[in-house]
């Protein structure tokens, strides 16, 4: 997944990050997922990273985005996407938001990945996704 995350994040930065100096820090880790998990995982990452470039740096013109994927144990996958941008506006409950992108991301995490998505708002925004790795089918790096 490392190569895909790297390509995706750099592509989204070129599309949405013009006029801003956003540093991408990707923590490499060899994580293999089945295709049935790699596809929804890629869709979720696309939405989260797009949202960062569209919304996290409205007030700031520079910042940092950190993306990591790891396996804290042999069957658990942990993905973290963190920015030091403006943060989620006070009083905004992202769980009740009706925006299609974030709603889709939550559905893919809970429905297809059978995982959890947690959001922290502290000096920017950090989203953590955790799910159990499946053993079905061919693995995608």
Put a short name on every predicted segment.
Residues 129-141:
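C-terminal end segment of the histidine kinase catalytic
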């Amino acid at each position: 997944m490392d190569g895909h995350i790297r390509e995706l994040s750099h592509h989204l930065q070129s599309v949405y990050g013009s006029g801003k100096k956003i540093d991408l820090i990707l923590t490499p880790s060899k994580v293999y997922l089945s295709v049935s998990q790699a596809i929804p995982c890629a869709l979720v990452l696309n939405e989260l990273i797009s949202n960062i470039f569209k919304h996290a740096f409205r007030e700031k013109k520079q910042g940092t985005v950190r993306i990591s994927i790891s396996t804290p144990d042999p069957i658990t996958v942990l993905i973290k996407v963190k920015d030091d941008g403006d943060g989620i506006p006070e009083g905004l409950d992202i769980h009740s938001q009706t925006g299609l992108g974030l709603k889709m991301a939550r559905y893919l995490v809970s429905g297809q990945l059978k995982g959890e998505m947690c959001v922290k708002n502290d000096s920017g925004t950090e989203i953590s996704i955790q799910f159990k790795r499946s053993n079905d089918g061919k693995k995608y790096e």
